[in-house]
C-alpha cells in the first residue's frame, strides 16, 4: 500500500483506486521526521513535531467540485515529496470518492446536509454517503481530540454550481456566544476569498460540525464555479494555494489587522425551505449568486403563495428549486456592517 502511494505521491489517484475503503490503516515517517498516517481512503494526516495548529482541509464533499480536489492533491504531493515541509499538523479529507468517479455532486444524497448526526436521523444509515459522513465526523473528532491546546482550523473547500458576482466567498457558521475572528477573515481575504456570509442558525454542514463540536475556526469556502477535471484555470486559485501552503509550512503567520474595506460582509437574513412540489423561483435560472432584489419583489411562488423580498434589498445565494420537500432552496442575505468581529 505504501509503495502504491509513494510511487507517484498522487493521493487522489490512490484514493480513487480504493474508493470504498483501504485494507488497513498505516503510518510511516518522512525523511524530514514528519509522521504520515493514512487512516482510510481519502484520509491522510501529516504530524510534525511542535505544531501549534491542527488544520483540516476537506474537499470533494461534493464529488464534482474539482478545483479544491486539485489544490489539496497538489499540497499532499508536495508534502510527500518534501518539496514543502509541514510545520503544522494537517489532515486532508477527500470526502466522497465514489461521487468523484461518478462525476456527480453526490450518489444518493447531498453529503453536506448529513453532519452533526443528521446521517443517522430519518431513514438512518441507509446508504454509503450517510456512512461516509459519520466516518468523516469521527476522523475530525479523533484529529482534534488528540490535542487540547492547539488552534483548530477547518476549511471545507467547495466550488459553486452557478456563477457568482463575488467569485470566491466563505460561509462563517453560526457560533452563538463567540465573536467572529477578524484574523481568520483577513487570512481568507489573502486567499482571494473577499466575501463573507455570517450564518444565522445551526446547520448540518461539515464546517458547522467542526465549529460547534470543537470550537474550530471553521468555514465553508467557495472558490469559484464547478468545472470538470482538466478544465480548471488553476491560476485563478494561486492565491488560495499559496496561503494554504503558508498556513501549513510556517510556524507563525504575521497577523493582519481586520480591515472591513478589504471584504464584503453579508449576514443570512433567512433560509427559504421548500414546502410544496410546485415551488418555483421568479428569477432566471442562470441568475448569479449574490444577485440582489428590492423590497416587495417576488422571489418565488409555491402552494399558491408568493414569497417576497422582506428587506430594502436582499441578495440570494445557492438557489436550487430541485431539492426534496423540507430542504433549503435558497439563502437570502443582507449587508452585515455591524457583526461582532475581533
From Swiss-Prot:
InterPro entries: AspA/AstE_fam (IPR050178), AstE_AspA_cat (IPR055438), Aste_AspA_hybrid_dom (IPR007036), SuccinylGlu_desuccinylase (IPR016681). The active site is at 222. CDD domains: M14_ASTE. It catalyses: N-succinyl-L-glutamate + H2O = L-glutamate + succinate. Pathway: Amino-acid degradation; L-arginine degradation via AST pathway; L-glutamate and succinate from L-arginine: step 5/5. It holds the Pfam family AstE_AspA_cat. Zn(2+) binds at residues 62, 65, 158. The keyword Cell membrane does not apply. Keywords: Arginine metabolism, Hydrolase, Metal-binding, Zinc. Binds 1 zinc ion per subunit. Its cofactor is Zn(2+). It comes from the Bacteria. One of its GO terms (molecular function) is succinylglutamate desuccinylase activity. Its EC number is 3.5.1.96. Transforms N(2)-succinylglutamate into succinate and glutamate. NCBIfam families: arg_catab_astE, PRK05324.1. Belongs to the AspA/AstE family. Succinylglutamate desuccinylase subfamily. This is Succinylglutamate desuccinylase.
